[in-house]
Amino acid sequence: MGLHNPLPSSLKSECKKAGKILTSFVDPRQTLGAQEVIPPSVLTNAKGLVIMTVLKAGFLFSGRIGSGLIVARLDDGTWSAPSAVMTGGMGVGAQIGSELTDFVIILNSKAAVQTFARLGSITLGGNLSIAAGPLGRNAEAGGGASVGGMAPMFSYSKTKGLFAGVSLEGSVLVERRDANRSLYRGDITAKRLLSGQVAQPAAADPLYRVLNSKIFNLNRGDEGDIYNDVPIYADDEPEDIWGPSSKSTKRRDSADRSSSYSRRGDSYRSNRSRAHDDDDEDDYSFSRSKSLSRKTAGGSLRSSKMDNRRSKYADTPSPRRSRSYSDEDEESVYSSDVSTESSSQFSSRSSEYSKPSRPTAPKPKFKQDSLGPNQARAMYSFAGEQPGDLSFQKGDIIDIVERSGSHDDWWTGRIGYREGIFPANYVKLS
């Protein structure tokens, strides 16, 4: 079990932490085995989740602090935008030691979600009863039921450390409006977030990658490996490296290279120490459209996301280049440097040499590689933003694998051994 930060941080960081914690509770590959995971039946029927890390420490007098998030499943089966939460408290008695605990709390009823949404807080074991949830891949949700029926909340935890005499029951979870305000750029309440009135933020992608996997959306006919699309996180890797492949790493490296050109030297180094809140605002500016992020009747969640991304690029035929160091900028800087150097050299030697005249022969025209019948040339650079995107640079030649009759669409292409989808209005056919 890796150590996670229990102190309140930006909602973007909370989403990364929540994604890591959640995979360690639901995937047998990241636990002690198939008998130590939250049952898929519980996950599929969950109406909401609370994911958080709590630190408890003390000697006679003890303190407790923790932070995380809450997210709700909407009526159409998709997930709401997350709301940041925190808990804290003091205690007295025969208590000694320290303990760091990751919690996943399954909200089994809409009433549990609505209670938090309405009040902005919820008391574990107070407003609604809470019980230890069933464990094991083949366990049923009824395994954690009380005498009066299934408990409104199931609790799962993993602990690092030793602490005697403290329970999370009775703790109050409170929404963190400061973190919500920072990410969503407004005074957004948990009620609006959990009811689906706010679009899913791009900063929560590490969390949605887990929530949109098969184990949270099982059908009766599902067979085979139901865990093969759960992202894998390595505890010895940096916090923002995700999934079984390195696509997220490539996106981060690409962004770092772009940023290094536009913010050089001391200015660049100082800007790297900016607060998380600025990052949150940037991430939310790329959030999905609410109307297209919801799954329509009979449609798939993937197709809804595709429609949303198509809409995004159909409205912007040219890429965002404001933070990138473009080819034209590089040429301009190079030309300026050469011109300055040449002027200095010739002025100092004007008594010895005269400037040569331009050649009379016409400039050669270098022909670009010709395109095949199923090939296209990239007119703009495209940095993929999600798994399955095909990233490319301006001028790259793309082999078209599948396409439609419209350029306001997403096509499938291949560059070398890489294959994925890309916006068709970024390329030009032969």
Curated annotation (Swiss-Prot):
GO terms for biological process: actin cortical patch localization; actin filament bundle assembly; endocytosis. InterPro entries: SH3-like_dom_sf, SH3_domain, SH3_domain_YSC84-like, SYLF_SH3YL1-like, Ysc84_actin-binding. Residues 263-277, 304-313 have a biased composition (Basic and acidic residues). It comes from the Eukaryota. Keywords: Phosphoprotein, SH3 domain. GO terms for molecular function: actin filament binding; phosphatidylinositol binding. Residues 333-358 have a biased composition (Low complexity). SMART domains: SH3. Residues 371-430 form the SH3 domain. The modification Phosphotyrosine is found at residue 325. The modification Phosphoserine is found at residues 285, 318, 324, 326, 354, 406. GO terms for cellular component: actin cortical patch. The modification Phosphothreonine is found at residue 316. Residues 237-372 are annotated as: Disordered. Belongs to the SH3YL1 family. This is SH3 domain-containing protein PJ696.02. It comes from Schizosaccharomyces pombe (strain 972 / ATCC 24843).
